[in-house]
Swiss-Prot record:
This is Cobyric acid synthase. The keyword Acetylation does not apply. Transmembrane segments: none annotated. The lineage of its organism: Bacteria, Pseudomonadati, Pseudomonadota, Alphaproteobacteria, Hyphomonadales. It comes from Hyphomonas neptunium (strain ATCC 15444). SUPFAM superfamilies: Class I glutamine amidotransferase-like, P-loop containing nucleoside triphosphate hydrolases. Residues 252-439 form the GATase cobBQ-type domain. One of its GO terms (molecular function) is ABC-type vitamin B12 transporter activity. One of its GO terms (biological process) is cobalamin biosynthetic process. Pathway: Cofactor biosynthesis; adenosylcobalamin biosynthesis.
Length: 495
Protein backbone atom coordinates (compact mmCIF):
# COMPACT_ATOMS: atom_id res chain seq x y z
CA UNK A 1 0.00 0.00 0.00
CA UNK A 2 1.17 3.54 -0.75
CA UNK A 3 -0.79 6.15 1.14
CA UNK A 4 -1.83 9.54 -0.02
CA UNK A 5 -0.68 12.42 2.16
CA UNK A 6 -1.54 16.05 2.82
CA UNK A 7 0.04 18.57 5.16
CA UNK A 8 -1.45 21.40 7.22
CA UNK A 9 0.93 24.26 7.88
CA UNK A 10 0.10 27.51 9.64
CA UNK A 11 0.91 31.19 9.42
CA UNK A 12 2.26 31.00 12.99
CA UNK A 13 2.20 29.11 16.27
CA UNK A 14 -1.13 28.35 17.95
CA UNK A 15 -3.20 28.93 14.81
CA UNK A 16 -4.93 25.59 15.47
CA UNK A 17 -2.89 23.19 13.33
CA UNK A 18 -2.97 20.37 15.89
CA UNK A 19 -6.74 20.39 16.28
CA UNK A 20 -7.33 20.83 12.56
CA UNK A 21 -5.28 17.68 11.96
CA UNK A 22 -7.19 15.88 14.72
CA UNK A 23 -10.50 16.91 13.17
CA UNK A 24 -9.49 15.82 9.67
CA UNK A 25 -8.18 12.53 11.10
CA UNK A 26 -11.55 11.85 12.73
CA UNK A 27 -13.34 12.74 9.47
CA UNK A 28 -11.13 10.37 7.48
CA UNK A 29 -11.64 7.57 10.00
CA UNK A 30 -15.42 8.08 9.83
CA UNK A 31 -15.20 7.74 6.04
CA UNK A 32 -13.62 4.32 6.47
CA UNK A 33 -10.05 5.28 5.62
CA UNK A 34 -7.12 3.91 7.54
CA UNK A 35 -5.51 7.20 8.53
CA UNK A 36 -2.50 8.21 10.62
CA UNK A 37 -1.22 11.55 11.92
CA UNK A 38 2.35 12.68 11.40
CA UNK A 39 4.37 15.59 12.75
CA UNK A 40 7.99 15.53 11.54
CA UNK A 41 9.31 17.65 14.40
CA UNK A 42 7.55 18.87 17.50
CA UNK A 43 8.80 21.12 20.29
CA UNK A 44 6.89 20.47 23.49
CA UNK A 45 7.38 19.30 27.05
CA UNK A 46 3.96 17.65 26.90
CA UNK A 47 4.78 14.09 25.92
CA UNK A 48 2.86 10.84 25.70
CA UNK A 49 4.27 7.37 26.27
CA UNK A 50 4.00 4.70 23.59
CA UNK A 51 3.48 1.02 24.27
CA UNK A 52 7.11 0.25 23.39
CA UNK A 53 8.51 2.75 25.91
CA UNK A 54 8.97 5.70 23.55
CA UNK A 55 7.58 9.21 23.75
CA UNK A 56 5.88 11.54 21.30
CA UNK A 57 4.12 14.88 21.56
CA UNK A 58 0.74 14.69 23.27
CA UNK A 59 -0.88 16.46 20.33
CA UNK A 60 0.05 13.48 18.16
CA UNK A 61 -1.39 11.15 20.81
CA UNK A 62 -4.70 13.04 20.58
CA UNK A 63 -4.56 12.89 16.77
CA UNK A 64 -3.92 9.15 17.00
CA UNK A 65 -6.98 8.84 19.21
CA UNK A 66 -8.98 10.67 16.55
CA UNK A 67 -7.83 7.97 14.11
CA UNK A 68 -8.72 5.16 16.52
CA UNK A 69 -5.04 4.34 17.08
CA UNK A 70 -2.70 4.05 20.04
CA UNK A 71 0.32 6.41 20.16
CA UNK A 72 3.27 5.26 18.03
CA UNK A 73 6.75 6.75 17.77
CA UNK A 74 6.51 7.07 13.98
CA UNK A 75 3.74 9.65 14.43
CA UNK A 76 6.32 12.14 15.78
CA UNK A 77 9.87 11.01 14.94
CA UNK A 78 11.65 14.10 16.31
CA UNK A 79 10.53 15.64 19.61
CA UNK A 80 12.42 18.56 21.15
CA UNK A 81 11.87 19.05 24.88
CA UNK A 82 13.16 22.47 26.01
CA UNK A 83 15.31 22.18 29.11
CA UNK A 84 16.50 25.79 29.29
CA UNK A 85 16.35 28.89 27.12
CA UNK A 86 19.28 27.54 25.08
CA UNK A 87 19.10 23.74 25.27
CA UNK A 88 16.63 20.99 24.49
CA UNK A 89 16.56 17.23 24.88
CA UNK A 90 16.31 15.63 21.44
CA UNK A 91 14.03 12.59 21.21
CA UNK A 92 14.40 10.56 17.99
CA UNK A 93 12.03 7.68 17.27
CA UNK A 94 10.86 7.89 20.87
CA UNK A 95 14.28 7.72 22.53
CA UNK A 96 16.48 10.47 24.02
CA UNK A 97 19.60 10.92 21.91
CA UNK A 98 21.23 14.08 23.26
CA UNK A 99 20.73 17.41 24.98
CA UNK A 100 21.86 20.07 22.54
CA UNK A 101 22.16 23.79 22.04
CA UNK A 102 20.56 25.24 18.92
CA UNK A 103 23.76 25.33 16.85
CA UNK A 104 24.58 21.70 17.67
CA UNK A 105 21.05 20.66 16.79
CA UNK A 106 21.23 22.38 13.42
CA UNK A 107 24.44 20.51 12.65
CA UNK A 108 22.50 17.23 12.94
CA UNK A 109 19.66 18.23 10.63
CA UNK A 110 20.64 15.78 7.88
CA UNK A 111 20.55 12.86 10.31
CA UNK A 112 17.24 14.06 11.72
CA UNK A 113 15.78 14.54 8.23
CA UNK A 114 16.63 10.91 7.55
CA UNK A 115 14.82 9.82 10.72
CA UNK A 116 11.77 11.86 9.71
CA UNK A 117 11.60 10.43 6.20
CA UNK A 118 12.15 6.91 7.53
CA UNK A 119 9.10 7.19 9.81
CA UNK A 120 7.02 8.78 7.07
CA UNK A 121 7.89 5.96 4.66
CA UNK A 122 6.76 3.37 7.20
CA UNK A 123 3.43 5.14 7.68
CA UNK A 124 2.76 5.49 3.96
CA UNK A 125 3.33 1.76 3.60
CA UNK A 126 0.71 0.99 6.25
CA UNK A 127 -2.11 3.51 5.85
CA UNK A 128 -4.47 4.86 3.19
CA UNK A 129 -3.91 8.47 4.24
CA UNK A 130 -1.32 10.35 6.31
CA UNK A 131 -2.26 13.83 7.55
CA UNK A 132 0.84 15.83 8.37
CA UNK A 133 1.13 18.77 10.77
CA UNK A 134 3.74 21.46 10.32
CA UNK A 135 5.37 23.47 13.10
CA UNK A 136 5.33 27.22 13.63
CA UNK A 137 5.30 28.87 10.21
CA UNK A 138 6.96 28.25 6.83
CA UNK A 139 7.58 32.02 6.69
CA UNK A 140 10.45 31.70 9.19
CA UNK A 141 12.82 32.05 6.26
CA UNK A 142 15.88 32.43 8.49
CA UNK A 143 15.44 28.73 9.35
CA UNK A 144 14.57 27.47 5.87
CA UNK A 145 17.97 26.02 4.97
CA UNK A 146 17.80 23.62 7.91
CA UNK A 147 14.04 23.05 8.05
CA UNK A 148 12.63 19.55 8.48
CA UNK A 149 9.27 20.57 9.95
CA UNK A 150 7.56 22.56 7.18
CA UNK A 151 8.60 23.09 3.55
CA UNK A 152 11.86 21.21 4.04
CA UNK A 153 9.76 18.13 4.72
CA UNK A 154 6.97 18.88 2.24
CA UNK A 155 9.37 19.21 -0.68
CA UNK A 156 11.56 16.27 0.33
CA UNK A 157 8.53 13.98 0.66
CA UNK A 158 6.45 15.53 -2.12
CA UNK A 159 3.44 16.33 0.07
CA UNK A 160 0.96 19.09 -0.91
CA UNK A 161 0.19 21.74 1.71
CA UNK A 162 -2.88 23.53 3.02
CA UNK A 163 -2.04 26.76 4.86
CA UNK A 164 -4.15 27.72 7.89
CA UNK A 165 -4.52 31.29 9.11
CA UNK A 166 -5.82 32.37 12.53
CA UNK A 167 -8.22 35.30 12.17
CA UNK A 168 -8.79 35.60 15.93
CA UNK A 169 -5.40 37.21 16.48
CA UNK A 170 -5.95 39.69 13.63
CA UNK A 171 -4.04 40.33 10.43
CA UNK A 172 -4.91 37.03 8.79
CA UNK A 173 -4.94 38.47 5.26
CA UNK A 174 -1.44 39.86 5.71
CA UNK A 175 -0.32 36.60 7.30
CA UNK A 176 -1.49 34.47 4.38
CA UNK A 177 -0.49 36.80 1.55
CA UNK A 178 2.71 37.71 3.38
CA UNK A 179 3.65 34.05 3.62
CA UNK A 180 3.29 33.72 -0.16
CA UNK A 181 5.42 36.86 -0.58
CA UNK A 182 8.38 35.94 1.63
CA UNK A 183 8.82 32.22 1.00
CA UNK A 184 10.71 30.75 -1.92
CA UNK A 185 8.53 30.41 -5.05
CA UNK A 186 9.24 26.68 -5.12
CA UNK A 187 7.96 26.42 -1.53
CA UNK A 188 4.89 28.50 -2.38
CA UNK A 189 4.12 26.10 -5.23
CA UNK A 190 3.66 23.32 -2.65
CA UNK A 191 0.69 25.17 -1.15
CA UNK A 192 -2.52 24.10 -2.89
CA UNK A 193 -5.13 25.77 -0.68
CA UNK A 194 -5.74 27.82 2.46
CA UNK A 195 -8.36 28.04 5.19
CA UNK A 196 -9.37 30.56 7.84
CA UNK A 197 -9.57 29.33 11.44
CA UNK A 198 -11.17 30.66 14.66
CA UNK A 199 -13.64 33.09 13.05
CA UNK A 200 -16.13 34.87 15.32
CA UNK A 201 -19.24 36.50 13.87
CA UNK A 202 -20.89 36.29 10.46
CA UNK A 203 -18.53 34.54 8.00
CA UNK A 204 -20.37 36.17 5.09
CA UNK A 205 -18.59 39.39 6.03
CA UNK A 206 -15.25 37.75 5.22
CA UNK A 207 -16.24 36.18 1.91
CA UNK A 208 -14.93 39.11 -0.19
CA UNK A 209 -11.57 38.77 1.57
CA UNK A 210 -11.48 35.07 0.67
CA UNK A 211 -11.71 36.03 -2.98
CA UNK A 212 -8.98 38.62 -2.52
CA UNK A 213 -6.65 36.07 -0.90
CA UNK A 214 -7.32 33.60 -3.71
CA UNK A 215 -6.52 36.27 -6.29
CA UNK A 216 -3.30 37.41 -4.58
CA UNK A 217 -1.96 33.93 -3.84
CA UNK A 218 -3.38 31.67 -6.51
CA UNK A 219 -4.46 29.23 -3.80
CA UNK A 220 -7.93 27.77 -3.44
CA UNK A 221 -9.94 28.83 -0.38
CA UNK A 222 -11.37 25.82 1.46
CA UNK A 223 -13.59 27.85 3.79
CA UNK A 224 -13.90 29.62 7.10
CA UNK A 225 -13.88 27.63 10.35
CA UNK A 226 -15.77 29.39 13.16
CA UNK A 227 -14.65 29.40 16.77
CA UNK A 228 -15.67 25.86 17.75
CA UNK A 229 -16.54 25.23 21.40
CA UNK A 230 -15.33 21.64 21.03
CA UNK A 231 -11.76 22.91 20.66
CA UNK A 232 -11.82 24.30 24.20
CA UNK A 233 -12.70 20.85 25.56
CA UNK A 234 -9.68 19.17 23.99
CA UNK A 235 -6.18 19.10 25.53
CA UNK A 236 -3.95 22.08 24.76
CA UNK A 237 -0.41 21.28 23.68
CA UNK A 238 1.91 24.15 24.48
CA UNK A 239 2.66 27.07 26.73
CA UNK A 240 1.02 29.57 24.38
CA UNK A 241 -2.34 27.99 25.13
CA UNK A 242 -1.43 27.60 28.81
CA UNK A 243 -0.93 31.34 29.19
CA UNK A 244 -4.39 31.94 27.73
CA UNK A 245 -6.23 29.55 30.06
CA UNK A 246 -8.68 31.20 32.42
CA UNK A 247 -9.93 29.93 35.79
CA UNK A 248 -12.79 27.47 35.34
CA UNK A 249 -14.76 29.17 38.14
CA UNK A 250 -17.79 28.19 40.17
CA UNK A 251 -16.55 24.95 41.73
CA UNK A 252 -16.64 23.92 45.37
CA UNK A 253 -12.99 22.82 45.33
CA UNK A 254 -10.34 25.41 44.44
CA UNK A 255 -7.16 23.96 42.93
CA UNK A 256 -4.16 26.14 42.08
CA UNK A 257 -1.15 25.12 40.00
CA UNK A 258 2.00 27.28 39.85
CA UNK A 259 3.04 27.90 36.24
CA UNK A 260 6.60 26.54 36.32
CA UNK A 261 9.03 27.81 33.69
CA UNK A 262 9.50 24.34 32.13
CA UNK A 263 6.11 22.92 33.06
CA UNK A 264 5.41 19.57 31.42
CA UNK A 265 2.31 17.46 30.85
CA UNK A 266 -0.02 20.09 32.23
CA UNK A 267 -2.83 18.32 30.39
CA UNK A 268 -3.04 16.22 33.57
CA UNK A 269 -5.29 19.08 34.70
CA UNK A 270 -7.77 18.84 31.82
CA UNK A 271 -10.10 16.33 33.50
CA UNK A 272 -10.13 18.49 36.65
CA UNK A 273 -10.84 21.61 34.60
CA UNK A 274 -13.87 19.83 33.14
CA UNK A 275 -15.29 18.95 36.56
CA UNK A 276 -18.29 21.08 37.63
CA UNK A 277 -17.16 20.82 41.26
CA UNK A 278 -13.68 22.22 40.59
CA UNK A 279 -12.43 25.79 40.24
CA UNK A 280 -9.02 25.16 38.67
CA UNK A 281 -6.51 27.85 37.76
CA UNK A 282 -2.84 28.34 36.98
CA UNK A 283 -0.86 30.87 39.00
CA UNK A 284 1.43 32.89 36.69
CA UNK A 285 4.94 33.96 37.70
CA UNK A 286 5.01 37.01 39.91
CA UNK A 287 1.68 36.26 41.60
CA UNK A 288 1.19 34.64 44.99
CA UNK A 289 -0.73 31.40 45.39
CA UNK A 290 -4.04 32.41 47.03
CA UNK A 291 -4.45 31.35 50.64
CA UNK A 292 -8.00 30.08 50.23
CA UNK A 293 -7.27 27.22 47.83
CA UNK A 294 -8.06 23.66 48.84
CA UNK A 295 -5.31 21.96 46.81
CA UNK A 296 -1.99 23.05 45.35
CA UNK A 297 -1.04 20.90 42.37
CA UNK A 298 2.63 20.80 41.36
CA UNK A 299 3.04 19.56 37.80
CA UNK A 300 5.94 17.88 36.12
CA UNK A 301 8.78 19.85 34.61
CA UNK A 302 11.57 19.23 32.12
CA UNK A 303 14.04 20.81 34.56
CA UNK A 304 13.25 19.86 38.14
CA UNK A 305 16.23 21.56 39.77
CA UNK A 306 15.87 24.60 37.55
CA UNK A 307 12.18 24.92 38.34
CA UNK A 308 12.82 24.35 42.04
CA UNK A 309 14.98 27.47 41.93
CA UNK A 310 12.34 29.23 39.80
CA UNK A 311 9.61 28.31 42.30
CA UNK A 312 11.63 29.84 45.13
CA UNK A 313 12.35 32.97 43.10
CA UNK A 314 8.59 33.55 42.81
CA UNK A 315 8.12 33.11 46.56
CA UNK A 316 5.87 30.12 45.94
CA UNK A 317 7.80 27.99 48.44
CA UNK A 318 6.50 30.23 51.24
CA UNK A 319 2.95 29.96 49.89
CA UNK A 320 3.15 26.17 49.63
CA UNK A 321 4.64 25.71 53.10
CA UNK A 322 2.04 28.04 54.62
CA UNK A 323 -0.69 26.06 52.85
CA UNK A 324 0.70 22.84 54.34
CA UNK A 325 0.91 24.33 57.85
CA UNK A 326 -2.78 25.23 57.76
CA UNK A 327 -3.82 21.72 56.71
CA UNK A 328 -4.11 22.28 52.97
CA UNK A 329 -3.79 19.47 50.45
CA UNK A 330 -0.83 19.21 48.07
CA UNK A 331 -0.28 16.81 45.18
CA UNK A 332 2.92 16.60 43.16
CA UNK A 333 3.09 14.75 39.84
CA UNK A 334 6.45 13.61 38.41
CA UNK A 335 8.83 16.58 38.84
CA UNK A 336 6.34 18.13 41.24
CA UNK A 337 6.56 14.98 43.36
CA UNK A 338 10.34 15.23 43.37
CA UNK A 339 10.16 18.87 44.55
CA UNK A 340 8.05 17.90 47.56
CA UNK A 341 10.96 15.91 49.00
CA UNK A 342 13.98 16.95 51.03
CA UNK A 343 16.76 16.89 48.43
CA UNK A 344 17.09 16.97 44.65
CA UNK A 345 20.45 15.61 43.47
CA UNK A 346 21.75 15.61 39.91
CA UNK A 347 25.42 14.54 40.08
CA UNK A 348 25.70 13.89 36.33
CA UNK A 349 23.80 16.91 35.03
CA UNK A 350 20.98 14.79 33.59
CA UNK A 351 18.36 17.43 34.34
CA UNK A 352 20.51 20.47 33.52
CA UNK A 353 23.56 21.74 35.35
CA UNK A 354 25.01 19.19 37.78
CA UNK A 355 24.37 19.93 41.44
CA UNK A 356 21.87 19.55 44.24
CA UNK A 357 19.14 21.65 45.82
CA UNK A 358 16.93 21.32 48.87
CA UNK A 359 13.33 20.53 48.06
CA UNK A 360 10.26 21.73 49.90
CA UNK A 361 10.75 19.13 52.64
CA UNK A 362 7.08 18.19 52.82
CA UNK A 363 7.83 14.54 52.10
CA UNK A 364 10.67 12.59 53.68
CA UNK A 365 12.14 11.55 50.35
CA UNK A 366 15.25 12.30 48.31
CA UNK A 367 15.52 12.17 44.53
CA UNK A 368 18.62 11.39 42.47
CA UNK A 369 18.53 12.06 38.74
CA UNK A 370 19.75 9.17 36.59
CA UNK A 371 20.68 8.93 32.94
CA UNK A 372 18.36 6.01 32.25
CA UNK A 373 14.92 7.43 31.56
CA UNK A 374 11.76 5.60 32.60
CA UNK A 375 9.09 5.80 29.89
CA UNK A 376 6.24 3.32 30.04
CA UNK A 377 2.47 2.88 30.25
CA UNK A 378 1.47 1.51 33.65
CA UNK A 379 -1.51 -0.10 35.34
CA UNK A 380 -2.05 -0.71 39.03
CA UNK A 381 -4.15 0.19 42.05
CA UNK A 382 -4.66 3.32 44.08
CA UNK A 383 -3.19 2.62 47.52
CA UNK A 384 -5.85 4.68 49.31
CA UNK A 385 -8.95 3.25 47.62
CA UNK A 386 -7.89 0.05 45.89
CA UNK A 387 -9.37 1.36 42.63
CA UNK A 388 -7.71 0.20 39.39
CA UNK A 389 -5.68 2.91 37.66
CA UNK A 390 -3.71 3.33 34.45
CA UNK A 391 -1.42 6.04 33.16
CA UNK A 392 2.15 6.52 32.06
CA UNK A 393 5.56 7.44 33.45
CA UNK A 394 8.13 9.75 31.84
CA UNK A 395 10.93 10.64 34.24
CA UNK A 396 14.65 10.39 34.87
CA UNK A 397 14.79 10.31 38.67
CA UNK A 398 14.80 7.71 41.44
CA UNK A 399 13.02 8.72 44.65
CA UNK A 400 13.54 7.00 47.99
CA UNK A 401 12.80 7.75 51.62
CA UNK A 402 10.62 6.89 54.64
CA UNK A 403 7.44 8.42 53.22
CA UNK A 404 7.77 6.20 50.13
CA UNK A 405 6.81 3.36 52.48
CA UNK A 406 3.31 4.84 52.17
CA UNK A 407 2.95 4.64 48.38
CA UNK A 408 0.40 6.53 46.33
CA UNK A 409 -0.04 3.62 43.91
CA UNK A 410 0.69 -0.08 43.83
CA UNK A 411 2.10 -1.06 40.42
CA UNK A 412 3.32 -4.47 39.18
CA UNK A 413 6.78 -2.88 38.85
CA UNK A 414 6.70 -1.86 42.52
CA UNK A 415 5.25 0.86 44.74
CA UNK A 416 4.92 4.36 43.30
CA UNK A 417 4.94 7.71 45.02
CA UNK A 418 4.70 8.74 48.64
CA UNK A 419 2.18 10.10 51.15
CA UNK A 420 2.91 12.17 54.24
CA UNK A 421 1.96 10.75 57.67
CA UNK A 422 -1.15 12.98 57.85
CA UNK A 423 -2.16 12.04 54.30
CA UNK A 424 -2.38 15.64 53.10
CA UNK A 425 0.78 15.72 50.96
CA UNK A 426 0.96 13.20 48.13
CA UNK A 427 3.28 12.52 45.24
CA UNK A 428 3.29 10.20 42.24
CA UNK A 429 5.32 9.64 39.09
CA UNK A 430 2.26 8.56 37.10
CA UNK A 431 0.59 10.91 34.63
CA UNK A 432 -2.94 10.53 33.30
CA UNK A 433 -4.62 9.42 36.52
CA UNK A 434 -7.32 12.09 36.53
CA UNK A 435 -8.53 10.97 33.11
CA UNK A 436 -10.04 7.94 34.89
CA UNK A 437 -13.46 8.81 36.18
CA UNK A 438 -13.57 6.54 39.25
CA UNK A 439 -10.12 7.61 40.48
CA UNK A 440 -10.88 11.30 39.93
CA UNK A 441 -14.23 11.07 41.73
CA UNK A 442 -12.68 9.28 44.72
CA UNK A 443 -9.79 11.75 44.93
CA UNK A 444 -12.16 14.75 44.85
CA UNK A 445 -14.41 13.11 47.44
CA UNK A 446 -11.38 12.67 49.69
CA UNK A 447 -10.60 16.38 49.34
CA UNK A 448 -14.17 17.43 50.12
CA UNK A 449 -17.17 15.21 50.79
CA UNK A 450 -19.90 15.56 48.21
CA UNK A 451 -17.62 17.15 45.61
CA UNK A 452 -17.37 14.24 43.20
CA UNK A 453 -19.48 13.96 40.07
CA UNK A 454 -20.40 11.38 37.47
CA UNK A 455 -18.54 13.24 34.70
CA UNK A 456 -17.17 10.89 32.03
CA UNK A 457 -13.97 12.50 30.77
CA UNK A 458 -13.03 9.95 28.10
CA UNK A 459 -16.50 10.12 26.60
CA UNK A 460 -16.33 13.93 26.61
CA UNK A 461 -13.06 13.85 24.64
CA UNK A 462 -14.58 11.50 22.07
CA UNK A 463 -17.64 13.72 21.79
CA UNK A 464 -15.45 16.80 21.36
CA UNK A 465 -13.47 15.11 18.57
CA UNK A 466 -16.71 14.25 16.81
CA UNK A 467 -18.00 17.82 17.23
CA UNK A 468 -14.70 19.14 15.88
CA UNK A 469 -15.00 16.90 12.83
CA UNK A 470 -18.64 17.95 12.37
CA UNK A 471 -17.60 21.61 12.50
CA UNK A 472 -14.95 21.14 9.83
CA UNK A 473 -17.38 19.23 7.61
CA UNK A 474 -20.02 21.94 7.98
CA UNK A 475 -17.77 24.89 7.18
CA UNK A 476 -15.02 23.61 4.87
CA UNK A 477 -14.92 21.93 1.49
CA UNK A 478 -13.63 18.70 3.03
CA UNK A 479 -14.12 16.71 -0.18
CA UNK A 480 -11.72 19.07 -1.89
CA UNK A 481 -9.32 18.80 1.06
CA UNK A 482 -9.15 15.02 0.73
CA UNK A 483 -8.96 15.27 -3.06
CA UNK A 484 -5.83 17.41 -2.70
CA UNK A 485 -4.00 14.60 -0.92
CA UNK A 486 -1.41 13.08 -3.22
CA UNK A 487 0.79 10.03 -3.23
CA UNK A 488 4.24 10.77 -1.78
CA UNK A 489 6.61 11.85 -4.47
CA UNK A 490 4.11 14.28 -6.00
CA UNK A 491 6.01 17.35 -7.05
CA UNK A 492 4.40 20.77 -6.96
CA UNK A 493 7.92 22.19 -7.12
CA UNK A 494 11.46 20.96 -7.59
CA UNK A 495 13.04 19.81 -4.33
Amino acid sequence: MTARAIMIQGTGSDVGKSLLVAGFCRLAARRGLSVAPFKPQNMSNNAAATADGGEIGRAQALQARACGLDPQTDFNPVLLKPQSDCTAQVIVHGRPTATLEAADYMARRDTLRGAVLESFARLTARFDLVIVEGAGSPAEINLRDRDIANMGFARAAGVPVVLAGDIDRGGVIAALVGTKTVIDPADAAMIRAFLINKFRGDPALFEPAMADIERMTGWAGLGIVPWLSAAARLPAEDGVALEQMRPTGGGRIRIAAPMLSRIANFDDADPLRAEPSVDFFFVPPGQAIPRDVDVILLFGTKSTLGDMAFLRAQGWDHDILAHARTGGRILGICGGYQMLGQWLCDPEGVDGAAGELPGLGLLKTDTTMQGEKTVRPVTGQCARTGLPVSGYEIHAGLTRGPDAARPFLHLPEGPDGAISPDGRVEGTYVHGLFAQDAFRAAWLENVRAGASSDAAYGASVEAALDELADGLEAHLDVDRFFALAAAPGWRGAPS
